[in-house]
């Protein structure tokens, strides 16, 4: 399992709509946080090993209504 974080910039006034649509329609999303700064949302996803991250982001995240831009962070190791 691979953990991927996606920062999402939304069109004005669309943050809550994007978050609600994403959590309801994209099954690989674990959590969504609203954030301050350049991006409006931080989405935590768990993808299967070997799954094409680019296709996932392109097909599932960037196509959500109200998404303006994304920035993807690929993780290596979780420390606890």
Task: Enumerate the language-model features and the residues they cover.
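A compositional/biophysical signature of low hydrophobicity enriched in polar/charged and small residues
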Residues: 1-80
